[in-house]
């Protein structure tokens, strides 16, 4: 099997992006794991696959696979790179691009400065829709992780997120608490774990331990989930700068029942081809 690909990143969250409209490519879980290896493969956090639309009202279907080969529902940084990729490769000349995903639809708007704004949809806080095991919906849940008691928010941005407020992200126990939360029994589909430091009502610092990928330089849906939880808990206003290890995103949300918007860069690194 021979195919062309692009390497891209959104604030250091890096991707292998493949056009599966003009190329016939099949990715097994084993192949994805081998390609994701940073020593012997291409190396990436996620594989993004561009497919022809499943829905006639959309332009493309957008699939996301983690480095461990598991398919996931959402990737915000990937969505921005997806929009840049389909324009760079001449698959569309539109500036507003509609895509379907494993869990819904998204609108990707390419701005004049090259940044991309993504309508991430309406944040979902109902426990059974996250999914998260809880008796009822709460703004804050008490959870045990190892020997720690944590006060967390839970939300779905098309994929599940748990968010914990910390005093300082630099000293947060991401390496130990991240894996414990990712595989916590209360999240039957596993979860992305965010650790949020509130700088002020319009600025947070964030680190995210992504399910199936570990800690990444940036997580777009994680940034969205953190802001949604922060606004719901009364900690943040509706326009927030999110500072991640890889750089900054801008998030805007007017509150429950409203769609959330994320704006940030998408960078093309190089093109390549593989035979495997």
UniProtKB/Swiss-Prot annotation:
Pathway: Amino-acid biosynthesis; L-lysine biosynthesis via DAP pathway; DL-2,6-diaminopimelate from LL-2,6-diaminopimelate: step 1/1
GO cellular component term, pick one: cytosol
Name of one Pfam family that matches: DAP_epimerase
Site note Important for dimerization, residues: 270
Enzyme class: isomerase
Primary location: cytoplasm
Function according to Swiss-Prot or TrEMBL: Catalyzes the stereoinversion of LL-2,6-diaminopimelate (L,L-DAP) to meso-diaminopimelate (meso-DAP), a precursor of L-lysine and an essential component of the bacterial peptidoglycan.
PANTHER family for the chain: DIAMINOPIMELATE EPIMERASE, DIAMINOPIMELATE EPIMERASE, CHLOROPLASTIC
Similarity-based family: Belongs to the diaminopimelate epimerase family.
Protein name (database record): Diaminopimelate epimerase
Organism per entry: Vibrio campbellii (strain ATCC BAA-1116)
Gene: dapF
């Amino acid at each position: 099997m021979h195919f062309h690909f692009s390497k891209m990143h959104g604030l250091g969250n890096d991707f292998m992006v493949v056009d599966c409209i003009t190329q016939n490519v099949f990715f097994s879980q084993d192949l994805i794991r081998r390609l994701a290896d940073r020593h012997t493969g291409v190396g990436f956090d996620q594989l993004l696959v561009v497919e022809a639309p499943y829905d006639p009202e959309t332009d493309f279907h957008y699939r996301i696979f983690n480095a461990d080969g598991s398919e996931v529902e959402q990737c915000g940084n990937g969505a921005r790179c997806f929009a840049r990729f389909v324009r760079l490769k001449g698959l569309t000349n539109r500036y507003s691009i509609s895509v379907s995903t494993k869990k819904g639809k998204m609108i990707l708007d390419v701005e004049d400065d090259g940044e991309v704004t993504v309508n991430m949809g309406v944040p979902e806080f109902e426990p059974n829709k996250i999914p998260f095991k809880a008796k009822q919906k709460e703004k804050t849940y008490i959870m045990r992780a190892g020997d720690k008691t944590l006060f967390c928010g839970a939300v779905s941005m098309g994929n599940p997120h748990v968010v914990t407020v910390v005093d300082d992200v630099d000293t947060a126990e991401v390496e130990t608490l991240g894996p414990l939360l990712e595989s916590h029994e209360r999240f039957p589909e596993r979860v992305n774990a965010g650790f949020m430091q509130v700088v002020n009502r319009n600025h947070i610092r964030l680190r995210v331990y992504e399910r199936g990928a570990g800690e990444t330089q940036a997580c777009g849906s994680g940034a969205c989930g953190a802001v949604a939880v922060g606004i719901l808990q009364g900690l943040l206003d509706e326009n927030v700068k999110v500072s991640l290890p890889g750089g900054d995103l801008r998030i805007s949300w007017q509150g429950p029942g409203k769609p959330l918007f994320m704006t940030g860069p998408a960078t093309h690194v190089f093109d390549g081809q593989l035979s495997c």
